[in-house]
């Protein structure tokens, strides 16, 4: 394939990472981004790698699969991880970032790379004669989505996910909340709004009866479990939220707490957590409260949370439709298209779910696009690594039941020999093997 550059379509997490990886290998990149010419309802700025749903990149420990994935990406020179580390905000054991600072830094690193040319334009056709990484994300424009849909055998794979509301910290009644991380892990990074049993029951009743924004009548409500609207979770059962975002375990009342409680219990019946959303600490998001309620209903119901009675919402929760591909039938383990070999796909459209996973897919797609350009052999990462297991899973899953997947230890190749019963010790061993295998893979 004779060409002098590689196309990357989309400058989200996956596209920005792919473009950067290609350019770092000495190959010119044309990076196309339609924002600036055509906006989407969910994005607030024209910056790259904008975080729409949450500002958290989740756990950082190696005993957490996404923590392992992040460490692998660091070792592979990820621009997304480098920018995240530079803009992180307190979040206990998680890696959370200043949302605007993070996307601004990614934008600057990509735009200022001497081998990356940014083109602000909407692409409506899939190129046939140039190596191209398609990373247009869940909010792909209708025109291009139609072309991808045709590659996808006409099957419409989709699910809905949602973003949580963001609140002005100065409007939170601090006398009713307390600062603490679950199990006191890391620094006290979350504001916790405790509820008594009666407060929770009243809140649940209001939530399940609140009015939702309508979906298109011809579409079914299919949600990804990791980003499920809080009202959908509440309707599954009165205690479902108590095992999810309102779980009180490890969030005991502080000694100086004087607010309402159930008898002498040391732990609240339920807890709503708020996490810092920007470096200045002026904004907080309600953790796990992705929602599709009408905005007026969000204000009414969420102001029932102790401490939020007069809260000002700087952004209400929103929901959007995510389309994804039949990757088991359409993609190689390198994220290369089986039907149109000049194309690579990356990001949530491939069926990886989560910010870190999207960036990881862009990293692998970018590396392999560069290798194809240089006529080098493809790079298939070991299934013993987090980054390799994710690529293997989405390309080898049962197509009939394929759904988006977060990275987890269940998809990483099992350890050989006798099973280690202690979960933490087992995960430590898997992580140790993964990093050793990655280092060996990179030296071959």
UniProtKB/Swiss-Prot annotation:
FAD binds at residues 10-15. Its cofactor is FAD. Keywords: Cytoplasm, FAD, Flavoprotein, Methyltransferase, NAD, NADP, Transferase, tRNA processing. Its EC number is 2.1.1.74. It is found in: Cytoplasm. GO terms for biological process: tRNA methylation; tRNA wobble uridine modification. GO terms for cellular component: cytosol. GO terms for molecular function: flavin adenine dinucleotide binding; tRNA (uracil(54)-C5)-methyltransferase activity, 5,10-methylenetetrahydrofolate-dependent. It holds the Pfam family GIDA. It catalyses: uridine(54) in tRNA + (6R)-5,10-methylene-5,6,7,8-tetrahydrofolate + NADH + H(+) = 5-methyluridine(54) in tRNA + (6S)-5,6,7,8-tetrahydrofolate + NAD(+); uridine(54) in tRNA + (6R)-5,10-methylene-5,6,7,8-tetrahydrofolate + NADPH + H(+) = 5-methyluridine(54) in tRNA + (6S)-5,6,7,8-tetrahydrofolate + NADP(+). Belongs to the MnmG family. TrmFO subfamily. Catalyzes the folate-dependent formation of 5-methyl-uridine at position 54 (M-5-U54) in all tRNAs. This is Methylenetetrahydrofolate--tRNA-(uracil-5-)-methyltransferase TrmFO. It comes from Streptococcus pneumoniae (strain 70585).
């Amino acid at each position: 394939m004779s060409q002098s550059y590689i196309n990357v379509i989309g400058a989200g997490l996956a596209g920005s990472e792919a473009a950067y990886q290609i350019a770092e290998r000495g190959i010119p990149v044309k990076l196309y981004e339609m924002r600036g010419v055509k906006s989407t309802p969910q994005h607030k700025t024209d910056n790259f790698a904008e975080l729409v749903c949450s500002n958290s990149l989740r756990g950082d420990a190696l005993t957490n699969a996404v923590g392992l994935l992040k460490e692998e990406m660091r070792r592979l020179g990820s621009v997304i991880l480098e920018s995240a580390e530079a803009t992180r905000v307190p979040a206990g054991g998680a890696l959370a970032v200043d949302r605007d600072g993070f996307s601004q830094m990614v934008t600057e690193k990509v735009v200022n790379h001497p081998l990356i040319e940014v083109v602000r334009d909407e692409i409506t056709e899939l190129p046939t004669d140039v190596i191209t990484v398609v990373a247009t994300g869940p909010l792909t424009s209708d025109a291009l989505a139609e072309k991808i849909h045709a590659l996808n055998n006409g099957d419409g794979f989709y699910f809905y996910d949602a973003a949580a509301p963001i609140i002005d910290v100065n409007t939170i009644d601090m006398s009713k909340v307390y600062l603490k991380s679950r199990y006191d892990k890391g620094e006290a990074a979350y504001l916790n709004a405790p509820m008594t049993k009666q407060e929770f029951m009243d809140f649940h009743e209001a939530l399940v009866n609140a009015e939702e924004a309508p979906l298109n009548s011809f579409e079914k409500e299919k949600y990804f479990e990791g980003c499920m609207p809080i009202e959908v979770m509440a309707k599954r059962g009165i205690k479902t939220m108590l095992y999810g975002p309102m779980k009180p375990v490890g969030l005991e009342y502080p000694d100086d707490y004087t607010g309402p409680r159930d008898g002498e219990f040391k732990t609240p019946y339920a807890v709503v957590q708020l996490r810092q959303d920007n470096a200045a600490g002026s904004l907080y998001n309600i953790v796990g409260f992705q929602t599709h309620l009408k905005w007026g209903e969000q204000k009414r119901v969420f102001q029932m949370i102790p401490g939020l009675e007069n809260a000002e919402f700087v952004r209400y929760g929103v929901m959007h439709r995510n389309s994804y591909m039949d990757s088991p039938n359409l993609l190689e383990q390198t994220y290369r298209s089986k039907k149109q070999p000049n194309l690579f796909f990356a990001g949530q459209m491939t069926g990886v779910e989560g910010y870190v996973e999207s960036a990881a897919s862009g990293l692998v797609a970018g590396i392999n696009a560069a290798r194809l350009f240089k006529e080098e052999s493809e790079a298939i990462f070991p299934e013993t690594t987090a980054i390799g297991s994710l690529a293997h899973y989405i390309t080898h899953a049962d197509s009939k039941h394929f759904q988006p997947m977060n990275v987890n230890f269940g998809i990483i190749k099992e350890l050989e020999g006798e099973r280690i019963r202690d979960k933490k010790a087992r995960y430590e061993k898997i992580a140790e093997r993964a990093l050793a295998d990655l280092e060996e893979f990179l030296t071959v």
